[in-house]
Amino acid sequence: GDIDLLVESRKPNEVMDHFLAWEHTDHSIVRGDTKTSIRGPHGIQVDMRVVEKKSFGAAWQYFTGSKEHNVRLRSRAKKLGLSINEYGVTELNQTDGKILAGKSEKDVYKAVGLDWIPPELREDRGEFELSENGELPKLITLTDICGDLHMHTTATDGEATLAEMAAAAVDRGLSYIAITDHSKRVT
């Protein structure tokens, strides 16, 4: 796996210079005008893309959608006489470079007649039809979580005591927790 970073800046060269100077950089793989890739700790590839504010939403949408979702979104745009890429929504075959939408993800989806589709649903598995009909499901949020059924304390390999974990659970509004420390080996 790799790590992808998306950064908004009017000064991409300064951002990339700073990124390349990161003390954990093993070596640079590639550097372009808006994208830099490095080999970081433990051999992990880290890719960074820098875009302007007017394109951040389009880039965020592009990089958080599956390939299938993005192909379908571009196909929909094309039928409407539009083009979508990581820089924004433009009129198809335009030459002036005017971006119609791109600052926010909601603007990108609105430009093609859709409600915003959350990243978790961007798989081309029915989300377009649901969005067209205003029927996208409500996703689970932190307030929906009632408890935690897998927790380890300092008695084994956890980082907090039982009392600390219980207090943290109360602070977070949890109704229950289950301590699942490892059993001591029986010989």
Residue ranges and their predicted role:
Residues 1-2, 42:
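A short, glycine/Asx- and small/polar-enriched loop/turn
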Residues 4-6, 10-11, 127-187:
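An N-terminally biased module of ancient metal coordination in phosphate/nucleic-acid-related enzymes
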Residues 11-141:
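Acidic, metal-coordinating catalytic segment for phosphate/diphosphate chemistry
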